[in-house]
């Protein structure tokens, strides 16, 4: 097998390939449009359609604004539709700032896009065109959602699950900053918050119905969830509407951005701690990843192969992932431009590439 890693950075898209996930051949930056420098600005998110292999990239140009590009040959060539695929209807009086997340349903054609400002779009043609999910945009809570420090956006989309034992094709779970977790059981026709137990220490009511600054949610293989909140790491063992439990005991801090669930073992996940909301540095200025194999009851640092010298780059919410292989690989990139990989049967990280621009998004696939 071969493995493809896609790395979205502050200055364009980079890739890397490997046969063994230990040694890598990095490449880039890639011009998405060979005629000019399109795509050489930020690449905020990347999506890989597991059914068709189509790649989607959410970009931003200082001159042309936000863009969505797609590739049907694993990144060899890229196309931008003639008309913007994500457009707010005129009556909303809103405009796209950028795409934050792409997610794929169980069929090859249905794609979701989470964007800034807080909105969810759906495509039924593989990502060529998207339609606003009106019920979430028109939710009565929306007037009280507000931007987090990075902006106001839907950054997590998890089709097909509402929590453990709650899988269905009509289910969708989303998370946003700042607003919290919302779920739909009817393909987006109606939505309800699912934040019970998640704190919002910056609000007068520290456990409100909604308004939490959830940084990331990851779905485990049984449909249950892990969440990295603005403060606190959480697990939802039952349907998320029944509540969340804190699981950060054993981690050096309760703050961070990224969390990755094991694709086959629901008790296993990765977390990447950050000192605090004021200090965006790794704890003790040392780069490390933490793993649980018991649903957060305990955590252990996995830092073999990572820098021993003082390190100051952190992992952003979209910059860690798994390739989903039978023997899964796990990957992360930092704001210092370094990217690392490991496999489930190893406790050592291998450097994929170094000294890239600020890493914003990482995606991997077995090809």
Predicted segment positions?
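Extracellular glycan-interacting surfaces
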Residues: 1-367
């Amino acid at each position: 097998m071969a493995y493809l890693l896609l790395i979205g950075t502050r200055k364009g898209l980079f890739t890397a390939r490997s046969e063994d996930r230990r040694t890598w051949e990095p490449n880039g930056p890639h011009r998405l449009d060979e005629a000019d420098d399109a795509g050489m600005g930020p690449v905020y998110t990347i999506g890989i359609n597991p059914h068709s292999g189509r790649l989607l990239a959410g970009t931003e140009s200082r001159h042309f604004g936000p863009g969505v590009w797609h590739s049907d040959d694993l990144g060899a060539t890229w196309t931008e539709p003639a008309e913007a695929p994500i457009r707010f209807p005129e009556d909303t009086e809103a405009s796209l700032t950028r795409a934050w997340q792409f997610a794929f349903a169980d069929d090859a054609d249905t794609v979701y896009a989470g964007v800034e400002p807080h909105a969810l779009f759906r495509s039924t043609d593989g990502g060529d065109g998207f339609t606003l999910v009106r019920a979430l945009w028109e939710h009565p809570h929306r007037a009280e959602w507000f931007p987090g420090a990075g902006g106001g956006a839907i950054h997590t989309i998890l089709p097909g699950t509402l929590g453990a034992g709650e899988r269905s094709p009509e289910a969708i779970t989303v998370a946003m900053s700042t607003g919290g977790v919302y779920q739909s059981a009817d393909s987006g026709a109606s939505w309800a918050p699912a934040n019970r137990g998640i704190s919002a220490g910056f609000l007068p009511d520290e456990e409100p119905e909604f308004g939490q600054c959830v940084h990331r949610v990851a779905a485990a293989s049984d449909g249950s969830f892990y969440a990295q909140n603005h403060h606190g790491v959480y697990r939802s063992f039952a349907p998320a509407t029944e509540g969340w439990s804190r699981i950060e005991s054993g981690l050096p801090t309760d703050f961070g951005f990224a969390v990755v669930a094991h694709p086959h073992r629901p008790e296993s996940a990765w977390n990447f701690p950050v000192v605090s909301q004021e200090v965006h540095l790794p704890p003790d200025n040392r780069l490390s990843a933490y793993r649980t194999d018991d649903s957060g009851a305990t955590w252990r640092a996995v830092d073999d192969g990572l820098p021993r010298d003082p390190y100051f780059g952190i992992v952003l919410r979209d910059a860690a992932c798994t390739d989903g292989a039978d023997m899964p690989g796990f990957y992360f990139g930092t704001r210092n431009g370094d990217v690392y990989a490991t496999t489930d049967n190893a406790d050592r990280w291998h450097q994929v590439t170094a000294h890239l621009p600020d890493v914003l998004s990482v995606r991997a696939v077995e090809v």
